[in-house]
Amino acid sequence: MGYTLQQILRSICSNTDWNYAVFWKLNHHSPMVLTLEDVYCVNHERGLMPESLHGGRHAHDPLGLAVAKMSYHVHSLGEGIVGQVAISGQHQWIFSEYLNDSHSTLQVHNGWESQISAGIKTILIVAVGSCGVVQLGSLCKVEEDPALVTHIRHLFLALTDPLADHASNLMQCDINSPSDRPKIPSKCLHEASPDFSGEFDKAMDMEGLNIVSQNTSNRSNDLPYNFTPTYFHMERTAQVIGGLEAVQPSMFGSNDCVTSGFSVGVVDTKHKNQVDISDMSKVIYDEETGGYRYSRELDPNFQHYSRNHVRNSGGTSALAMESDRLKAGSSYPQLDSTVLTALKTDKDYSRRNEVFQPSESQGSIFVKDTEHRQEEKSESSQLDALTASLCSFSGSELLEALGPAFSKTSTDYGELAKFESAAAIRRTNDMSHSHLTFESSSENLLDAVVASMSNGDGNVRREISSSRSTQSLLTTAEMAQAEPFGHNKQNIVSTVDSVISQPPLADGLIQQNPSNICGAFSSIGFSSTCLSSSSDQFPTSLEIPKKNKKRAKPGESSRPRPRDRQLIQDRIKELRELVPNGSKCSIDSLLECTIKHMLFLQSVSQHADKLTKSASSKMQHKDTGTLGISSTEQGSSWAVEIGGHLQVCSIMVENLDKEGVMLIEMLCEECSHFLEIANVIRSLELIILRGTTEKQGEKTWICFVVEGQNNKVMHRMDILWSLVQIFQPKATNR
């Protein structure tokens, strides 16, 4: 918002009881916060106007120091009074008595301790749409006034609404002589604000208004603007352009009280304390009843009055006739005469037109041509090339309904769009704001640039006419009714030939048709496309949103398993059934047990032929107890118990016919020695090819057929000695 924002804050404090005005800007971050964007503070010491609030010159000024401290505060959206006003849109009047009684925590939480100590007695916080919040402070107690709240919102609406007229009409006026000053009708003035009528007359009787030019570099040393009081705002100004008087509607709409060449924007506050921004243009002053009423039938697309409406009837009488038409609520007919262009003066800058360019992410935004100022001595010089810049339509009902989180692009407070004579968007009965989209062709944008550049040495009005005719064709015809979602929509494309075929008018004025607004309906919000120069038609297909998939329950997967993974799961399930105790093992343990079983089966297959060649028992029971001698050539080793008399041999180790294979036989009194013998054999790195037990009388006969691992050759005595160690302790105990 820059310099214009400073002007608005200064105008609010000028000639009023407010001592400072602060604008808290809504920054669309995560989380969204409000930071101090601009501030104006009335200096109590005449002649002292510090250039910055942080210059250290407020040590002797408690109010200036308190305002300077506000720049360090950050308000979260929805927290504190400022944050709550921003999210709710409801303004709040706060008095010092309320804070001092029982709400001391509010001072600390909102950072108002220094302000209360500096003498601030009234604080007003007003939400201005999705832009942010305005905070006012006064050293005296200011009574609640809904008209002031409405006026503040009007001022910021003028900055953020591209469909309205330019904001400079509110903040600047060029009145050169006292005779040209408009007079305020006493009836309107009394109804608007009887308490400030004297101050308003005094201000209007001053010799001109002190206006600070936008080119002024040192703004801080200028005196505050002497605007009309903040409870009034001129919505139309009578301007003299080449000897012609024109009544120009301002940014707040065209349905206002018009009497004696002056209009006062007033609001019937008995209906509601806060007037919706979308209804600001519908307040009409009724001279017969002395009250105000709303009208929704007026066509807001008319912009200017003809010369005959003003001059032929004596000026004021013509305005009275127009006021009667406003009271009747009827729309103005199409003008048959030339339409006046609302240039400030012949020395003022020429404001360029704008074209609508929709945005895909946030509704409609607009491509506007940059304003170019004309020098006093070069009225017919070439206009510079037009440059397009984006600005957000943050004042629309759609963005107000969706909240500040949706309008993220509305935080750019640079110089906003200013319309010269663009037709206002009119909402039909069967169409809502959420169904509007604007479609235009980029070919017409090039034509607008060519038209303005080719007439550089000609008349300035002819250049404006070419730009206006281009803009009139950029907006296509308004559709009568909405089509169902998903169906193709008929798109009307305006061609460049229609611009070229129209002959340039001498006055450079083309009357615009209010129906040159294209609305393409969509049930999901704003959506449109801009064609390139080679395109012939608009795309008609709309992307149908995908249906939400059902979420999978915990433990379930919405995706089907890959085939290879499913096969692995099946094989593991089979292994758990084959391997003993496999159902309780982990996958690693299951695989380890499987490997052991595979190795065992491999060894069995290798030694299967050896099991059939096992020799019969060589143990012979002799009654005499004599030692039997083996008849085999390989030899055998015997172990007997030596005692008082000879007994049957206990252990025998014998070589079999096949090399490396041995037969181990023994008689044991207990069968429990079988596992101990098997462990000893395995410890000797021998492979047990066969192991059997047989009951013989009171003793148990045990037989093993063994083989050395990896063809290892073992001596019989080594095996015999190891087995004797098993029985030796038991013989000793006996």
Swiss-Prot record:
GO terms of molecular function: DNA binding; DNA-binding transcription factor activity; protein dimerization activity
Top-level lineage group: Eukaryota
Record localization: Nucleus
A GO CC term attached to the entry: nucleus
InterPro entries referenced in this protein's UniProt entry, alphabetically: bHLH_dom, HLH_DNA-bd_sf, LHW-like, MYC/MYB_N
Physiological role: Transcription factor that may regulate root development.
PANTHER family: TRANSCRIPTION FACTOR BHLH155-LIKE ISOFORM X1-RELATED, TRANSCRIPTION FACTOR EMB1444-RELATED
Family: Belongs to the bHLH protein family. LHW subfamily.
Protein name in UniProt: Transcription factor EMB1444
UniProt source species: Arabidopsis thaliana (Mouse-ear cress)
